[in-house]
Amino acid sequence: MIYLVEDDKSIRELLVYTLNNSGLPANGFEKPSEFYRELRADDADLIILDIMLPECDGLTMLKNLRVDEKTKHIPVMMLTAKGSEYDKVVGLDMGADDY
């Protein structure tokens, strides 16, 4: 299962639809709290995080995922409109598998 955390409804629905229609089961979450609730109940095979989110930014979520024994092995991709080299380096340095 792929978990996508994206607060923009249009982007979230488009990506979840595309992944599901490609044979990749996916579930989208608007808020980090919704994501964490589901993650406690069921493991993810891949996590895709937006950086700019309500409640908590994606980089903080990434940091929390990397220090947790249950989730540190799950691949994480960062998804954002912020595309500067600096932002990419920060995301990858914090443990993202792709940006």
Question: Can you say where each PLM-predicted feature lies in the sequence?
Answer:
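N-terminal/domain-start alpha-helical segments
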Residues: 1-99
